[in-house]
Curated annotation (Swiss-Prot):
Membrane topology recorded in Swiss-Prot or TrEMBL: Peripheral membrane protein
Entries under PROSITE patterns matching the protein: WD_REPEATS_2, WD_REPEATS_REGION
Domain of life: Eukaryota
InterPro entries assigned: G-protein_beta_WD-40_rep, Sec13/Seh1_fam, WD40/YVTN_repeat-like_dom_sf, WD40_repeat_dom_sf, WD40_rpt
Gene: sec13
Location in or out of the cell: Cytoplasmic vesicle, COPII-coated vesicle membrane; Endoplasmic reticulum membrane; Nucleus, Nuclear pore complex
Keywords assigned: Cytoplasmic vesicle, Endoplasmic reticulum, ER-Golgi transport, Membrane, mRNA transport, Nuclear pore complex, Nucleus, Protein transport, Repeat, Translocation, Transport, WD repeat
Gene3D superfamilies assigned to the protein according to its UniProt record, in alphabetical order: YVTN repeat-like/Quinoprotein amine dehydrogenase
Record's protein name: Protein transport protein sec13
Assembly: The COPII coat is composed of at least 5 proteins: the sec23/24 complex, the sec13/31 complex, and the protein sar1. Component of the nuclear pore complex (NPC). NPC constitutes the exclusive means of nucleocytoplasmic transport. NPCs allow the passive diffusion of ions and small molecules and the active, nuclear transport receptor-mediated bidirectional transport of macromolecules such as proteins, RNAs, ribonucleoparticles (RNPs), and ribosomal subunits across the nuclear envelope. Due to its 8-fold rotational symmetry, all subunits are present with 8 copies or multiples thereof.
An individual GO BP term: ERAD pathway
Length: 294
């Protein structure tokens, strides 16, 4: 199994694996039952992501086959007293020429937007609007894009600012096999995503990036690398173009970083099957608060 994710309500679990399928389970209390197996990919499925429920019951998947598939659960009108729901593939995006390693939905305030990171060096952004899908695709990292994460829709400090700006921002960070992180901003006039910042520091592939959902006074991005470090990049609202980083060192190659919903705790996992939790102390240093062994 390569990825697993609960839907917004925690009632559905989707998993994906090397057998080219996606499985949907219903969670009821302590039990779960398989309700659907989705087939459509021609290679290992690396990543799945649930859209926000305001857009419907929608799941995106990406695979080694270079495709991004969008699946939707729809209610079937039948004479049966039991509700019948069926999953259908509603969009097949196959413009990438190599593995699509990660898909990530934008914050729902920005619209129904899906960003996709591919080994072909390109990022695509799919948008569902007025009952149809449109896409943009652009070159991002020379040696391939491994990961992608959206910034929160509200900019840092907008909650505490006396005169907040337009608030809605469309930006995301990518991590590449060129050891770099890149931050991309949407320009509403040109309707394109432009590179606004390159963050250097890792000495090997950046495997995962995660933008913290916190929108207090700082922005935080965590990155996990094959160089056995996690870097936590911070930018203050008073100087948004300036990013400082702190390095956390490990004994193993690192695969994933993930923030808690409030954005104050970071989970790190790597090649040793351990998960560690980290928190910023009052001096601004990141400290390990817990080790979880499988």
């Amino acid at each position: 199994m390569h990825d697993a994710g609960l839907d917004y309500y925690g009632r559905r679990l989707a998993t994906c694996s090397s057998d080219k399928t996606i499985k949907i389970f219903e969670i009821e209390g302590e039990t779960h039952r398989l309700v659907e197996t989705l087939k459509g990919h021609e290679g290992a499925v690396w990543c799945i992501a649930w859209a926000h429920p305001k857009f419907g019951t929608i799941l995106a998947s990406s695979s080694y086959d270079g495709k991004v598939l969008i699946w939707r659960e729809q209610h079937q009108n039948t004479t049966s007293p039991v509700a019948v729901n069926t999953w259908t593939k509603v969009f097949d995006f196959s413009l990438h020429t190599a593995s699509v390693n990660m898909v990530s939905w934008a914050p729902h305030e920005s619209g129904c937007l899906l960003a996709c990171a591919s080994s072909d060096g390109h990022v695509s952004v799919l948008e569902f609007q007025d009952n149809s899908w449109t896409h943009q695709i652009f070159h991002a990292h020379g040696m391939g894009v491994n990961s992608i994460s959206w910034a929160p829709a509200a900019s840092p400090g907008s909650l505490i600012s006396a005169n907040p700006g337009p608030g809605q921002q469309r930006r995301f960070v990518t991590g590449g096999s060129d050891n770099l992180l890149k931050i991309w901003d949407y320009n509403s006039e040109t309707k394109s995503y432009n590179l606004s910042q390159t963050l250097e520091g890792h000495s090997d592939w950046v495997r995962d990036v995660a933008w913290s959902p916190s929108i207090l006074s700082k922005s935080y991005i965590a990155s996990a690398s094959q160089d056995k470090t996690v870097r936590i990049w911070t930018s203050d609202v008073s100087n948004p173009g300036q990013w400082a980083s702190q390095q956390l060192e490990f004994d193993t190659v690192l695969w994933r970083v993930s923030w808690s919903p409030s954005g104050n705790i970071l989970a790190v996992s790597g090649g040793d099957n351990k998960v560690s939790l980290w928190k910023e102390n009052l001096k601004g240093q990141w400290e390990k608060v817990k080790d979880i062994e499988e």
